Design a protein with these regions (language model features):
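N-terminal nucleic-acid-engaging modules of covalent nucleotidyltransferase systems
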Residues: 1-163, 167-172, 176-177, 181-201, ...
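Nucleic-acid 5′ end/cap handling module spanning
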Residues: 51-97, 148, 187-188, 192-314, ...
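Short glycine-/polar-rich loops that comprise or flank the Walker A/P-loop
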Residues: 118, 156, 329-330, 354
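Surface-exposed, charged, gly/pro-rich loop-and-adjacent secondary-structure segments at domain edges
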Residues: 120-136, 301-336
């Protein structure tokens, strides 16, 4: 809706986000402004949402243009980006898109004993006081109500990245160096449900590259680089902030099920459930480990769609089961960002952000990876790192 309104008025979507919680039906002032018939309305919202600043991914050649001394580095945590606002006795917790999720995290809102607005990551603490996997946070998301047991089992907290409003002062135009100093003082008085994202000492980018590739924290996705002199600018300006995520993990899996996609892909079978081999009672069997789609070229999409239709062995409503045996099947190279244990999945494992990286038409299905490979990866790269 916000994007559609921005297109109607030919304005930046961040301007709509600024007003979103401060306008009410029938929205006469808003539409009059978008139609060019009136000035921009003033938001009457208390504890309003401020549009977030986003980072650009590091691309080839970017680092060669940067001076490490100009940038602060911090961990990129695997939670959800939030904005916590407490002003004039009103407290609100927003997602990065401005959705109010205060009702889902009343324990966090109750602990927001401050005046101002902070940008941060919503996470869950594990039993040792560290960061729990994203799957724990998922137990709290998208709920209309949350029980006392859920709050106790999955205690949420905020890891603060930035300070947007200090008391009654909007500090977004001040440089990051000053906002960070204020944030440190701010968080020191904010209570146990809010801590600060630690900075990583920057000597050179080679040192940061090693940390990015193998973060010492189990649930850090990589690094963020932010210019010390950067203002907090809504949107995704090029240059001030970069995200430098670790390289994805890769596994060869076999297509097991297919569904039609959405939008322009709605006529094609482009969403796939894939599995790896494990030893069952009757020998080797496939066990699902994830579901993903890939932005194929038109030629690839047509070829995949034909493969699914030609080798369907069963149907379950909109889902087609595809022939997948050791001597026949389609291997997909899957890229993913993380791995965690999950009792909800038959394999006992769940991937974070899986996507089809490559189609292995050349590889026999029997040579796809086994569940033991993922178990080893989990033990060595995630379980082990969590105990460092």
């Amino acid at each position: 809706a916000k994007t559609a309104l921005a297109k109607v008025g030919d304005v930046d979507v961040t301007e709509i986000e600024e007003l979103w919680h401060g306008v009410e039906p029938p929205y006469d002032d808003l539409f009059a402004w978008l139609e060019g018939c009136a000035n921009k309305p003033v938001s009457a919202a208390k504890a309003p949402f401020r549009p977030v600043m986003l980072a650009n991914p590091i691309e080839d050649g970017d680092l060669q243009k940067l001076d490490p001394a100009d940038y602060a580095a911090e961990w990129k945590w695997d939670g959800i980006r939030i904005q916590a606002v407490s002003e004039a006795g009103v407290r609100r917790l927003y997602t990065r898109t401005g959705d109010d999720i205060s009702h889902t995290f009343p324990d966090v809102v109750a602990a927001m004993e401050f005046d101002g607005a902070i940008d941060g990551e919503l996470l869950v603490r594990d039993g040792d006081g560290g960061v729990a996997p994203f799957s724990d946070l998922q137990q709290r998301l998208n709920r209309k109500t949350v029980s006392k047991k859920q709050m106790e089992t999955y205690p949420a907290f905020i890891r603060a990245y930035d300070l947007l409003v200090d008391g009654a002062e909007d500090v977004r135009r001040k440089p990051l160096s000053e906002r960070r100093k204020r944030l440190e003082r701010f968080v020191a008085e904010a209570g146990e449900r809010i801590d600060i994202s630690e900075l990583v000492a920057v000597t050179d980018f080679d040192q940061l590259e090693a940390l990015r590739a193998d973060p010492p924290h189990a649930h850090a996705e990589g690094l963020m680089l932010k210019r010390w002199d950067s203002a907090y600018t809504p949107g995704r300006p090029k240059g001030p902030w970069f995200k430098w995520k670790r390289d994805p993990f890769l596994v060869d899996a076999v297509m097991m099920y297919a569904q039609r996609g959405h939008g322009k892909r709605s006529s094609f079978y482009s969403d796939y459930t894939f599995g790896v081999w494990r030893e069952g009672e009757a020998g080797a069997e496939l066990v699902p480990v994830g579901k993903a789609y890939f932005g194929f070229t038109d030629a690839e999409l047509k070829r995949l769609d034909k493969f699914v239709r030609d080798h369907t062995v069963d149907r379950f409503g909109p889902v087609r089961a595809v022939k997948a045996q050791r001597d026949f099947g389609l291997v997909l190279e899957i890229a993913f960002e993380g791995l965690q244990r999950s009792p909800r999945h038959k394999s006992g494992l769940a991937m974070r952000f899986p996507r089809v990286h490559r189609i292995r038409w050349d590889k026999p299905a029997g040579e796809a990876d086994r569940i033991e490979a993922l178990e080893t990866l989990l033990a060595e790269r995630f379980d082990a790192r969590a105990t460092r």
